[in-house]
Amino acid sequence: MAASADLSKSSPTPNGIPSSDTANDTMDPFHACSILKQLKTMYDEGQLTDIVVEVDHGKTFSCHRNVLAAISPYFRSMFTSGLTESTQKEVRIIGVEAESMDLVLNYAYTSRVILTEANVQALFTTASIFQIPSIQDQCAKYMISHLDPQNSIGVFIFADHYGHQELGDRSKEYIRKKFLCVTKEQEFLQLTKDQLISILDSDDLNVDREEHVYESIIRWFEHEQSEREVHLPEIFAKCIRFPLMEDTFIEKIPPQFAQAIVKSCGEPSNTSGCTQRLGMTASEMIICFDAAHKHSGKKQTVPCLDIVTGRVFKLCKPPNDLREVGILVSPDNDIYIAGGYRPSSSEVSIDHKAENDFWMYDHSTNRWLSKPSLLRARIGCKLVYCCGKMYAIGGRVYEGDGRNSLKSVECYDSRENCWMTVCAMPVAMEFHNAVEHKEKIYVLQGEFFLFYEPQKDYWGFLTPMTVPRIQGLAAVYKDSIYYIAGTCGNHQRVFTVEAYDIELNKWTRKKDFPCDQSINPYLKLVLFQNKLHLFVRATQVTVEEHIFRTSRKNSLYQYDDIADQWMKVYETPDRLWDLGRHFECAVAKLYPQCLQKVL
């Protein structure tokens, strides 16, 4: 019997080189991209195309069956079913626009798709017909990122029609968050009964009074009274929390609606126990950025002080532990931060790398949501909301020959979801202040006082303050810009108070803020409960048994513009946190149940 060959050993090949059974499976990472690129070239040049697709208005596209079948179950079924279309050289598709078909084909041959507000819904519809969920998801993501009070209802109705869960949920969340703005839009009146109920029957509705919910239902009803009257009892029963309404308001409800209320749930109950809406729990708080727990080294925290109740909460700290960010609370109570720097691991490093981060705070989840980055990295920029847009102004960077102040200004358009460069300031500024009043932006630093008109993209100069200083504090109060404290040219700290009458273009000296410089105070100016307040960090050094001990107190002072004086109205729990020299304060309405309670 012949001996069997030992297959485990390599045997010579015809060219004498031993072979091995060990497979060497390699992959060219550029192979797929190369094929896609060649297919696109053949599509553009009309080479080897084997099907013509005709869409609305007679527009035709010559393409490849295998490419269409690869991205779309719709086309794969059409070309492999054995029916008439599988052998035809030309197929006609009704209900697809030429632009949408062009975008789908561009995606098929390049994996890229260009979305705009004008094409996104038509493309979503086409992708739904062709069963291409990857395009639908990209369209949904685009629509989510472009939600605003004007389009959110339309997007929600659109998502409901096509059954896209994420788009429907996110648009509904937005509607609840911006409820009072959204209900003023005409599209709100187009909601079906079930869609209206799905929005209103929620604890997360951002209303401070239940009466707003009732009024929105009546407005919706009055748009089509004859068809919608039959639905009122069900809507009232599922959506109105009558125990949260004022008795005097209920007593004034017209008989027509009172009867519907009785049909829905009997007489409105005055008993307690009804869950409050999210907006009813909101409390105006002072937020301190660049603070640190005393027992956690230098790890940053963001305490939120509820002056009315004395409670202290903690906001989610900025991502990447960002410091010296620009901070803005918009008129819609959205909190934004931009720029800043990430702390160095080296204690001696002072030349921090500027960042271009841009984040928005999500109240309901207590987390920061990433937004499009600034065009220019910047530390200590000022954020201002004006004419429906946001502006990032000035700041500093550490580049090239060292520290440089910035002239540059950029503008964020929430509808376009992008930043764009606008006219730079005539002078570079850091440690400056920027405020808005009647569609103009005002920027102050030392001997410079500038104004900016967004409509004209123009900067101009105004009368400078009587005591020029930097690192001061500015806020608009009763049609005047108050500028408080700061550092003069000789590096001396002062607590001067000046008010600029915007209409008269005139500065007026006020009484200085009474402050003992021995306590090394650091001040922040905020508009809290519609009044000017100063948040003061004071440091006191004492000697006990030849040992120096440092203690800090944080106090709040309120300004009486009639008497032109400051009164201490609150002293914070000093054991909870420490504030760095560069701490910043902002005021916003926050929701206690969404925050971590500290005290």
From Swiss-Prot:
Top-rank taxon: Eukaryota
GO annotation, biological process: neural crest cell development; neural crest formation; protein monoubiquitination; regulation of translation
Pfam families: BACK, BTB, Kelch_1
Subunit structure as annotated in this protein's UniProt entry: Component of the BCR(KBTBD8) E3 ubiquitin ligase complex, at least composed of CUL3, KBTBD8 and RBX1.
Lineage: Eukaryota, Metazoa, Chordata, Craniata, Vertebrata
Keywords assigned by UniProt, alphabetized: Cytoplasm, Cytoskeleton, Golgi apparatus, Kelch repeat, Repeat, Translation regulation, Ubl conjugation pathway
InterPro entries xrefs: BACK (IPR011705), BTB-kelch_protein (IPR017096), BTB/POZ_dom (IPR000210), BTB/POZ_KBTBD8 (IPR028764), Kelch-typ_b-propeller (IPR015915), Kelch_1 (IPR006652), SKP1/BTB/POZ_sf (IPR011333)
UniProt protein name: Kelch repeat and BTB domain-containing protein 8
